[in-house]
């Protein structure tokens, strides 16, 4: 009889896509996969496209909200715990693996109360509150970045750095060749602001880079933002033949393949994909991210000289200068991308799968 794994992940691609990578790898080995999430978040649309049964619980976030919202969230949390317990009792999975998101907390607690082993995967260099709590009852705590290890000191014996699972097509992105940079007079810049777009990138990139000679730009600006971004480029006299705008990029692997370097936020999945693609990057961490986790994610590459980081507060002053430097010395861009590739966790997905099988085999 096939082993069964319940994946818990939701809210953002940073949680969902690593979960999908592991789900698909386990399914390829004959496992039966189910998913626990929330009906209002992106997992409700994305997961069914992969033919994975998804089960919903009525949970909401609590952190950083007003007293009324917190009370409502607490009530929903209690309901979601009982809902998760009913679902898990019915499914009887051999193991539950949480990748973060609202469903992971109640799902992990419910699984443990039923004697089902729990694995937690933390993508960020600064661990989230839910995973910190779940680590106390988890059989294993798996980390995307080694810098997060000190935050799980209470579960030190069960903490393992495995990297962040990345989709196979990202790993297939071909490295840039040194000879293509000999005497290069142009570079391709990919600007990625996430599914909603990043307002600071939409405003600053056109102003600071729109008229740089030798720069071709693909700019993902988020749904509903393209008209304003076009005007921003046109207002500085940019040649729109060298600028391509999109609300959303469906094929990120092709976008990375085209790019010489990327300007982007520093979510855990983005940082991991940049490294896997072997591209140089200028990270602009979201300054209001919980526990400043995006800065810590970016630093995992920056401290290896494998990426640049510019604080949002000084982006306007420094972005154009950084891009001009690469246009003048494109070989530096190539070298940084190659260094980024050496920081990538190429075996992350199989590492997680190995831990899943190990825990089930041990009967923890």
From Swiss-Prot:
EC code(s) of this entry: 2.4.1.227
SUPFAM superfamilies referenced in this protein's UniProt entry, alphabetically: UDP-Glycosyltransferase/glycogen phosphorylase (SSF53756)
GO CC annotation terms, alphabetical: plasma membrane
GO molecular function ontology, one term from the record: undecaprenyldiphospho-muramoylpentapeptide beta-N-acetylglucosaminyltransferase activity
InterPro entries on file: GlcNAc_MurG (IPR006009), Glyco_trans_28_C (IPR007235), GlycoTrans_28_N (IPR004276)
UniProt keyword annotation of Transmembrane helix present: no
Binding site for UDP-N-acetyl-alpha-D-glucosamine: 12-14, 124, 167, 195, 249, 268-273, 294
Record membrane topology: Peripheral membrane protein
Task performed by this protein: Cell wall formation. Catalyzes the transfer of a GlcNAc subunit on undecaprenyl-pyrophosphoryl-MurNAc-pentapeptide (lipid intermediate I) to form undecaprenyl-pyrophosphoryl-MurNAc-(pentapeptide)GlcNAc (lipid intermediate II).
Protein name listed in UniProt: UDP-N-acetylglucosamine--N-acetylmuramyl-(pentapeptide) pyrophosphoryl-undecaprenol N-acetylglucosamine transferase
HAMAP family: MurG
Principal place of residence: membrane
PANTHER family, sorted: GLYCOSYLTRANSFERASE, UDP-N-ACETYLGLUCOSAMINE--N-ACETYLMURAMYL-(PENTAPEPTIDE) PYROPHOSPHORYL-UNDECAPRENOL N-ACETYLGLUCOSAMINE TRANSFERASE 1
Pathway(s) of this molecule: Cell wall biogenesis; peptidoglycan biosynthesis
Localisation: Cell inner membrane
Keyword Cell inner membrane: yes
GO biological process: carbohydrate metabolic process; cell division; cell wall organization; lipid glycosylation; peptidoglycan biosynthetic process; regulation of cell shape
Reactions mediated catalytically: di-trans,octa-cis-undecaprenyl diphospho-N-acetyl-alpha-D-muramoyl-L-alanyl-D-glutamyl-meso-2,6-diaminopimeloyl-D-alanyl-D-alanine + UDP-N-acetyl-alpha-D-glucosamine = di-trans,octa-cis-undecaprenyl diphospho-[N-acetyl-alpha-D-glucosaminyl-(1->4)]-N-acetyl-alpha-D-muramoyl-L-alanyl-D-glutamyl-meso-2,6-diaminopimeloyl-D-alanyl-D-alanine + UDP + H(+)
Family named by the database record: Belongs to the glycosyltransferase 28 family. MurG subfamily.
Organism encoding this protein: Alteromonas mediterranea (strain DSM 17117 / CIP 110805 / LMG 28347 / Deep ecotype)
Keywords per UniProt: Cell cycle, Cell division, Cell inner membrane, Cell membrane, Cell shape, Cell wall biogenesis/degradation, Glycosyltransferase, Membrane, Peptidoglycan synthesis, Transferase
